[in-house]
A protein has these predicted regions:
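Transmembrane helical cores of multi-pass secondary ion antiporters/exchangers
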Residues: 1-401
């Protein structure tokens, strides 16, 4: 067990690094998460100041909490009309990116690496097309994209994680039983999305109405977080996408004028909404800082197979880039965000979902699961580096425009 003073010292250093990295991002366009991941690698794999094995059991919970808070914050900054206008294109993007990427990476693992199809499909679903909300939400805000592009990135990051998880669980079932059903996977995705959205809409409508009566009380923000956690749990219990439900919750809270129209009365919560947004921004920043350092801490880099890992990780990343390029070209065709197409192709950072699924694969006793973690590490590093390069050039382009 780590000494509390040591833990507090590390936490203080992480917060200082996160603040400096954020200011550096605003000046240079180089994302802060790169520096934070590197800080984690130094604290973990390089110096062994913090044990990776201590942190692995916490990954799922910490990742879920971070994604929940980041998506809620992202939803609070989305215009409802823009969301409805772009949701169809985002769905096309996710389908054309996640499914082909998963299958091509699985084929690569089977034919090139010689893995069996069950393991290859499981691995493909782990790295096949996630774009992590922990990167996309703050990055889309920091780069000052037009709103339609920002909505596209945030919504894509929420939806592709759901696709990845469902495909992963489908292929786990294939490994355990020897059978898999495409119908089951498709119906699970439709059901997951629908239930999550309906629960998010219903509970957020209720809560926005309640806020009109409790807005003058102290600790309203904490109470809102409690209801957000309840929304997440309820959506999950009923088989819906908990992440989509909290995203919808944030969107409805931000667009409370829609609720006023629905209820046919004024709620007068504009001041409260601004205060909630500011508090949520601070909390999201803190969680993002720790989760990126966390990712650096748990990466698995072995000097014995580093060249193999770099080669295979690079080839997988190349597959992702090619498929993403084609998917973005189709999904943005003749749209208002087509001008940002080249940047969208490069914003492919992976993080929380593949890292969590790779750890879950170990828990399921999947052969090669330890190899999964190593390769996932390289894919995370490569995709985040490409995203850093893409955001750097995007920042230069947007500042010049």
């Amino acid at each position: 067990m780590q000494d509390p003073i040591f833990a507090f010292s590390i936490a203080a250093v992480i917060i200082f690094i996160a603040f400096i990295a954020d200011q550096f991002f605003k000046k240079s366009g180089i994302p802060s998460f790169i520096l934070l991941i590197f800080a984690g690698i130094v604290l973990g794999p390089i110096t062994n100041l913090i044990s990776r094995n201590v942190l692995l059991p916490l990954l799922g919970t910490v990742a879920e909490l971070t994604l929940m808070m980041v998506l809620f914050y992202g939803g609070m900054d989305i215009n409802l009309h823009k969301l409805l206008a772009n949701s169809g294109r985002v769905f096309i993007q996710v389908v054309l990116y996640v499914i082909p990427s998963t299958m091509l990476i699985a084929a690569f693992a089977n034919y090139v690496l010689g893995w069996g199809w069950p393991q290859a499909l499981i691995f493909g679903s782990i790295v096949g097309g996630e774009t992590t909300a922990a990167v996309m939400v703050p990055l889309s805000r920091g780069l000052k994209f037009k709103e339609a592009t920002r909505v596209f990135l945030v919504l894509e990051s929420a939806m592709n994680s759901v696709f990845s998880v469902i495909l992963f669980l489908t292929f786990i079932g294939f490994y355990q039983t020897g059978t898999a059903s495409s119908y089951t996977a498709i119906s699970s995705i439709v059901s997951n999305f629908s239930i999550g959205i309906v629960i998010g809409l219903t509970l957020s409508l209720i809560w926005v109405s309640v806020l009109a009566y409790v807005k003058q009380y102290k600790y309203t923000y904490v109470l809102t977080l409690g209801f957000l956690l309840a929304t997440y749990v309820i959506a999950d219990v009923f088989g819906g996408s908990a992440l989509l439900s909290v995203l919808v919750f944030g969107v409805l809270l931000a667009n409370h004028k829609f609720v006023e129209t629905f209820l046919r009365r004024k709620l007068h919560i504009d001041t409260l909404k601004r205060r909630l947004f500011e508090f949520q921004g601070e909390l999201s920043f803190l969680l993002e800082a720790f989760i990126f350092v966390f990712l650096g801490l748990i990466v698995s880099i072995s000097l014995n197979n580093i060249f193999f890992g770099l080669l295979i990780g690079g080839m997988i990343t190349l597959i992702l880039l090619i498929v993403r390029g084609l998917a973005v070209s189709v999904s943005t065709f003749k749209s208002t965000i087509s001008k940002d197409k080249k940047t969208l192709m490069l914003l492919c950072a992976q993080g929380l979902t593949p890292a969590t699924l790779a750890v879950l694969a170990i828990g399921y006793g999947i052969p090669l699961a330890n190899t999964f973690i190593g390769l996932v590490t390289y894919v995370i590093i490569f995709t985040n580096t490409i995203t850093a390069v893409g955001s750097f050039f995007a920042a230069k382009h947007l500042s010049a425009a």
